[in-house]
Amino acid sequence: MGDTITLLSRREIEKMRQAGQLAAALLDHLAPMVQPGITTLELNDEAEKWTKAHGAISAPLGYNGFPKSICTSINEVICHGIPHRKRVLQAGDIINVDVTPIVDGYHGDCSRTFFVGTPSPVAEKLVKVTEECLRLGIEAVKPGGKIGDIGAAIQSHAEAQGFSVVRDFVGHGISKIFHTAPQIPHYGKAGKGKRLRPGMVFTIEPMINEGTWEAVLLDDGWTAITKDGKLSAQFEHTIAVTEDGVEILTLGE
């Protein structure tokens, strides 16, 4: 990931909007499948089929060697969980599903955490707070503001609720390139970091943990889990900085 921040034109942002809307529609399509007894590979295969049927490409497949089309991160998995035929969803699980279709060369990147059956009280609170963190991070985006404003808004809310913010994985610039500048930490201090300018497009994707923020990478080289084995949740949108605020590009129709 380089340091050069590319400002997108209105036409390019429209392309990103089209990709983002398809990503949101894919999550809407997968949501009813998230039930006890289904495997993460079944979710992956349906996502791949649906993406192809809509004339798009699954960006994660083969990206730096990633073997599947989506990421499925269950319970203590923070991010980049690999779908597998033996990973069966159980009642009480939480699962983050992260999708990135490519439409006409542009990436639409978003994720949601779903409940599998009835969640525990702590899981329910964690997921609620994580979604609130995403909303607060987006609300902190203003032209002329700083990247640190985003992380500060997220971190203050998460920690006030007794949770922690993952440090090892951050949001990122995105367009025709999957991951590019700027990096968007989900922690930090308001007024710090690079200035937000109209035309910047990036993801905000807070990963919030029940316990410690520390992560451990598994031997597969992809799956990151919480160091203490406690729960982690995540929500993600791709956004554009506008002349007067912010636009979420990964909203459904």
Swiss-Prot record:
Its cofactor is Co(2+); Zn(2+); Mn(2+); Fe(2+). Pfam families: Peptidase_M24 (PF00557). One of its GO terms (biological process) is proteolysis. A divalent metal cation 2 binds at D109, H172, E205, E236. Binds 2 divalent metal cations per subunit. Has a high-affinity and a low affinity metal-binding site. The true nature of the physiological cofactor is under debate. The enzyme is active with cobalt, zinc, manganese or divalent iron ions. Most likely, methionine aminopeptidases function as mononuclear Fe(2+)-metalloproteases under physiological conditions, and the catalytically relevant metal-binding site has been assigned to the histidine-containing high-affinity site. Substrate binds at H80, H179. GO terms for cellular component: cytosol. Keywords: Aminopeptidase, Hydrolase, Metal-binding, Protease. Belongs to the peptidase M24A family. Methionine aminopeptidase type 1 subfamily. It is an enzyme of class 3 (hydrolase). Removes the N-terminal methionine from nascent proteins. The N-terminal methionine is often cleaved when the second residue in the primary sequence is small and uncharged (Met-Ala-, Cys, Gly, Pro, Ser, Thr, or Val). Requires deformylation of the N(alpha)-formylated initiator methionine before it can be hydrolyzed. This is Methionine aminopeptidase A. Monomer. PANTHER family: METHIONINE AMINOPEPTIDASE. Its EC number is 3.4.11.18. A divalent metal cation 1 binds at D98, D109, E236. GO terms for molecular function: initiator methionyl aminopeptidase activity; metal ion binding; metalloaminopeptidase activity. CDD domains: MetAP1. It comes from Synechocystis sp. (strain ATCC 27184 / PCC 6803 / Kazusa). It catalyses: Release of N-terminal amino acids, preferentially methionine, from peptides and arylamides.
